[in-house]
């Protein structure tokens, strides 16, 4: 890679722990699992699986899964936590899978890390069987456009969320708890055009809100949704 991931892998593992971070636990997990539902998915690829957290959730739901990530330390951790799982070091832009070999592809907060978006989307399309689903959770584009401004205060002292250069595709480095990684800011139109051009059809779009928790952080997430969730289908 690395985009900071090789250097940050151990801090990432420590930060997520066994339960995952706040956004996953209180915003994304429930709607992501709801999209799995009882829909008869058989084989899923988790693109950018990290330490394998969502792969383990899908396996617990009865799916055969393949987790792929370019960071060796994260794949090592995934294998340690799930010795019977299938975890592979690899890149989203060149998946080690046969054509039409999966009926579900998942990107759980990983598209924002990938350098070549079009190549990754094209690979997801390639490995899906006709009618297969590409389930995506990603950072909101206005969230990635906020760096380094984000939350500040207006002239009257009211707290507000500011963004700038929204249409400019660019790398954004973020750091917290010993982690320093490169995300990519892309306007939402860039993601949409890439997915449409690859041959996907949008079937679901949501901006999930926090659940099961209150407080200042939850209030901020309700004012400015941090994430989006999309489901795209390959044509039959």
Tell where the protein language model's regions lie, with residue ranges.
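Conserved class I S-adenosyl-L-methionine
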Residues: 1-39, 53-57, 74-77, 134-169
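Class I SAM-dependent methyltransferase SAM/SAH-binding core
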Residues: 45-47, 51-94
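A short acidic, Gly/Pro-enriched loop at the edge of an enzyme's catalytic core
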Residues: 93-104
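A short SAM/SAH-binding and catalytic strip from SAM-dependent methyltransferases
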Residues: 104-116
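A short glycine-rich, Lys/Arg-flanked "PGG" loop and its adjoining helix->strand segment in the class I
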Residues: 118-133
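Short alpha-helix
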Residues: 171, 183-205
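Core SAM-dependent methyltransferase catalytic element
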Residues: 200, 218-236
């Amino acid at each position: 890679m690395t985009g900071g991931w090789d250097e940050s892998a151990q801090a990432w593992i420590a930060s997520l722990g066994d339960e995952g971070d706040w956004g996953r636990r209180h915003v994304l997990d429930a709607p992501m699992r709801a999209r799995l539902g009882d829909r008869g998915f058989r084989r899923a690829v988790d693109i950018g699986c990290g330490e394998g957290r969502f792969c383990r959730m899908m396996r617990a739901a009865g799916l055969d899964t393949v987790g792929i990530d370019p960071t060796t330390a994260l794949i090592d951790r995934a294998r340690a936590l799930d010795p019977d799982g299938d975890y592979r070091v690899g890149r989203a832009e060149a998946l080690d899978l046969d054509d039409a070999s999966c009926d579900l592809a998942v990107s759980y907060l990983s598209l924002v890390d990938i350098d070549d978006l079009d190549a990754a989307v094209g690979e997801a399309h390639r490995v899906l069987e006709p009618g297969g689903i590409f389930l995506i959770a990603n950072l909101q584009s206005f969230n990635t456009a906020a760096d380094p401004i984000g939350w500040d205060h207006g002239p009257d002292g009211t707290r507000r969320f500011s963004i700038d250069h929204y249409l400019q595709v660019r790398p954004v480095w973020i750091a917290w708890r010993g982690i320093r990684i490169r995300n990519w800011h892309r306007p939402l139109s860039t993601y949409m055009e890439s997915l449409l051009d690859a041959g996907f059809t949008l079937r679901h779009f949501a901006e999930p809100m926090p659940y099961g928790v209150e407080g200042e952080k939850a209030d901020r997430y309700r004012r400015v949704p941090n994430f989006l969730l999309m489901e795209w289908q390959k044509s039959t």
